Amino acid sequence: MEDSAMDMESMGPLRPQTFLFGCELKAEKEYQFKVDDEENEHQLSLRTVTLGAGAKDELHVVEAEALDYEGNPTKVVLASLKMSVQPTVSLGGFEITPPFVLRLKCGSGPVYVSGQHLVALEEEPESEDEEEDTKIGNASTKRPASGGGAKTPQKKPKLSEDDEDDDEDEDDDEDDEDDLDDDEEEIKTPMKKPAREPAGKNMQKAKQNGKDSKPSTPASKTKTPDSKKDKSLTPKTPKVPLSLEEIKAKMQASVDKGCSLPKLEPKFANYVKNCFRTEDQKVIQALWQWRQTL
């Protein structure tokens, strides 16, 4: 089990390649499609079956022979053609896995079969440094922002508020000193006895400007951090992994576009992990069972 797991991790993601395919069939000429490359997966998507220009006006039946799910040979009729009735047939992406044989069951031909040859090439595995970077990036995205970590960025706003409060206090102190200097000058000047009352009033004004105005600033201090805490305490929503049905829909869309899915279970599991970022074995197993039905 450990060796198979290491092999799956060492395999890179599959990169599909598409090539043109075409062959000619005659009464005594069949076409055999074999692949000696065992490292990559091959699949043929047949598109059209067409009678050649020199074909007779007779019935032509095109037959394909391949292996079924249990590995037993089976034969399937692909198209029935006749020059005066139906000279060409569109198969619309009839996918077949090699090895297989195409032949004329009846008719003299020539008949031309065209389609696409799909090859799933394995990309080179990433280096250890790149794997570590991806793991660190995934771990950072999965961790939601906690309340304790969100308190640290609030120090800078508090410092800036304290600096503003200190500047306001300094301005208030300067204003108080100016008022006191004015009061001293008024006291020194020869005035009547009732002149003492304005001095007391001025002292009260100075107290109001100095001492009474200071408590108003902490109120603003207590209000602003609360709103900032509420904003910082809200954790970031982590990315929700795709559900089983969403992954099936994406795979079906890629199949409809002409891409092929891996035939072997280890490669299929690696394909799901790399392309859809899921590690749930139950989901991978369910997708593998669904892939068998395609």
UniProtKB/Swiss-Prot annotation:
Please provide the record's keywords in A-Z order.
Answer: Chaperone, Cytoplasm, Nucleus, Phosphoprotein, RNA-binding
InterPro entries linked: NPM1_C, Nucleoplasmin, Nucleoplasmin_core_dom, Nucleoplasmin_core_dom_sf
Q: Where mainly located?
A: cytoplasm
Q: Which Gene3D superfamilies match?
A: 1.10.10.2100, Nucleoplasmin core domain
GO-annotated biological processes: cellular senescence; centrosome cycle; chromatin remodeling; DNA repair; negative regulation of cell population proliferation; positive regulation of transcription by RNA polymerase II; regulation of centrosome duplication; regulation of endodeoxyribonuclease activity
Q: Does the keyword RNA-binding apply?
A: yes
Function in brief: Acts as a chaperonin for the core histones H3, H2B and H4. Associated with nucleolar ribonucleoprotein structures and bind single-stranded nucleic acids. It may function in the assembly and/or transport of ribosome. May stimulate endonuclease activity on apurinic/apyrimidinic (AP) double-stranded DNA. May inhibit endonuclease activity on AP single-stranded RNA.
Name of this protein: Nucleophosmin
**Record organism:** Gallus gallus
